[in-house]
Each structure stands twice: as structure tokens, then as C-alpha cells.
Amino acid sequence: SCIGRLRIRDRNDIIDLEGLGSGGWTISPMLDNIEILESDAEFILVLEKDAAMIRLAEARFWRKYPCIILTAKGAADIATRMFLRRINKELKLPVFTLVDSDPYGHYIHSVYLRGSKRLSYESPFLATPNIKLLGVLTRDLEKYKIPNDCRIPMNQTDIKRTKELLNEGFVKKNKAWETDLKLALKLKIKAEIQALSAFGFEFLTDQYIPEKLSTGDWI
């Protein structure tokens, strides 16, 4: 789903995504019927989780920080990736992901970045090569003093998946990404986006995201 500073035409209906409830606009797989009308957004934020979307929607995050927010509610489905690629191409805005600090979150970021291995033949039409990983980074856990009880020990599958990611060419090309995954492997910890709410519900919207965006703290 999608919400924020964007107006579209869906066949004959003009939809202002800023005025929708916390559920946002359900991204249509029939993108040929969608026309991008206007946007004064300054960036696009892609969220792994619906819970984070609801939090940002409740805070009307896009009013203070002009943006378009998308989520595929977990796995990066084709409709969401196609729509992201389309608005990215038409609006030419910076794009960021906010995912859990775990191998699956990093994998989801990689699917938006370059497409999935399973659909490699379609990847050029679905990828957003300029997307940046805003968080949650392993280094953020220390930087923002995330409490230990919000940090989760990695299991064997997590360790295996992290090692697999470190073997990927697209990770090796990005030294900051490689460093963050190596740190996760060294500490053997992971954390969910929700860990940030240890400091209160406003921490994500009022401090974490704005601070990282203003300081360029992404991968």
C-alpha cells in the first residue's frame, strides 16, 4: 500500500494519497491504468512492515517530512516493486528502505535494489538501483543505545543467511553494507524496527528517521 504526498488517477478516479486513512491506497497490479498526476515529495520511503506504516500514518509523517511511503507488508511483491520503479522513474526522488535489522530485512532491501533471483529475467523491469538502506542498521543498535532486551540473538539460519549475503557480488561492491553485515555476524544479534519504540512511539518518526536522513546515515 502507499500513502503520502502523491496524487494519481486510477481510470476515472483522482486519488489524493495524503487524505487517505492509515491503510493508504492499495497498490493496483493494473499499473497501465494509473497516471501519476503530481507530487511535492522530497523522498520515497519503503517500509518492510505494516506496523511501521501504521505508526508513520498515525503521525502524518509526510506532512512534516514531504514524502511518499510504501509497504509491501513483508515480502517485496511484484506490484509494489513495479509501482516503486515507476514513481522513482517519473518523480526522480531519492528512495530509502526501512527494514528489520536481520538477514531477511537485508534480503528484502536487495530485492527492491536488484530484483529477486527467482524472477531474474524480469529484474530489470522491477529493480530500483538507486535505493538506499536507511535502517535498521546493525551499527544503529549501539549508536542509538537500543536496550539489550530488544536485541534478539541470531539463530543458525540467520548466521547462514548473513554469510550467504556476504558472498553476494552486490554486497561485496558496497563496503558499508558488507561492514554492517560483518558486524551483525560478529555480534550475532538482530533487531526489529519495533525495537526503536523502546524509547516511545515518537522516537521512530521524530528522531530516528529524520536524524538519519539529515546526516546521510544510510548504506
Question: What is each of the regions a protein language model found here?
Answer:
Residues S1-P94, P103-I219:
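Nucleic-acid enzyme cleavage-core boundary/entry regions
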